[in-house]
UniProtKB/Swiss-Prot annotation:
One of its GO terms (molecular function) is DNA-binding transcription factor activity, RNA polymerase II-specific. GO terms for biological process: regulation of transcription by RNA polymerase II. The keyword Zinc-finger applies. May be involved in transcriptional regulation. Pfam families: zf-C2H2. A zinc finger (C2H2-type) spans 63-85, 91-113, 119-141, 147-169, 177-199, 213-240. Residues 36-49 have a biased composition (Low complexity). Keywords: DNA-binding, Metal-binding, Nucleus, Repeat, Transcription, Transcription regulation, Zinc, Zinc-finger. The lineage of its organism: Eukaryota, Metazoa, Chordata, Craniata, Vertebrata. Residues 52-63 have a biased composition (Basic residues). This is Zinc finger protein 575. PANTHER family: ZINC FINGER PROTEIN 200, ZINC FINGER PROTEIN 358.
């Protein structure tokens, strides 16, 4: 009796079925095993450091323009861009005979009529109507231009400017778009479309400057009088004394 009471009081071991070694009883589980907390910082991350931002993948631009080297993410963007190559300018300026392919170009142009230039250059007295114009101008103050032309000593701030320069000055077929009205030819369809306005100047509805200025020597027309004066000086050696450009 005393031996049985001592065994029941101990409660820690039971005799094994073979009677050789005692088997230790395990305490019953109170629930599923708890996983280690995930909020604890690992060996490579500190508790106070912010998470590293993930790098965005480069944008996919599968829609390439057949007239130039630009590419776009959506077909609608490509269709809007191709208006510039086709010469379509459905957005006329109400203050002069000029017209534009995009509403944003028209808005930027109208600032030239209002005279608003809210973006001054911090390095010189010039000011600009748009931040993009100021950003392009700031490159003129940069000590270096990182895109040199391999065919001449010129260098450029943007790859697009270098590509346009090489296409215009160093390509064998630099001017594949001839004008049907005169011997001139151009490198881009947009340049040809702008030139053809000289032969057939449009009249924008509601325009206040419908009177074009035509050269009496060659018949070329200009939307502004100062451009006519510059043309006559450079092409026909005509001097206009006492007149402001």
């Amino acid at each position: 009796m005393l031996e049985r009471g001592a065994e029941s009081a101990a409660g820690a071991t039971d005799p094994s079925p073979t009677g050789k070694e005692p088997v230790t009883k395990e305490a019953p589980h109170q629930g599923p095993p708890q996983k280690p907390s995930q909020s604890a910082p690992g060996p490579t991350a500190s508790a106070g450091s912010p998470p590293r931002p993930r790098r965005r993948p480069p944008p996919q631009r599968p829609h390439r323009c057949p007239d130039c080297d630009k590419a776009f993410s959506y077909p609608s963007k490509l269709a809007t861009h191709r208006l510039a190559h086709g010469g379509a300018r459905p957005h006329p300026c109400p203050d002069c005979p000029k017209a534009f392919s995009y509403p944003s170009k028209l808005a930027a142009h109208r600032l030239t009529h209002s005279g608003a230039r809210p973006h001054p250059c911090p390095h010189c007295p010039k000011s600009f109507g748009h931040r993009s114009k100021l950003a392009a101008h700031l490159w003129t103050h940069a000590p270096t231009r990182p895109y040199p032309c391999p065919d001449c000593p010129k260098s450029f701030c943007y790859p697009s400017k270098l590509a346009a320069h090489r296409h215009t000055h160093h390509a064998t077929d630099a001017r594949p778009y001839p004008c049907p009205h005169c011997p001139k030819a151009f490198s881009f369809p947009s340049k040809l479309a702008a030139h053809r306005l000289c032969h057939d100047p449009p009249t924008a509805p509601g325009s206040q400057a419908t009177a074009w200025h035509r050269c009496s020597s060659c018949g070329q027309a200009f939307g502004q009088r100062r451009l006519l004066l510059l043309h006559q000086r450079s092409h026909h050696q005509v001097e206009h004394k006492g007149e402001r450009d």
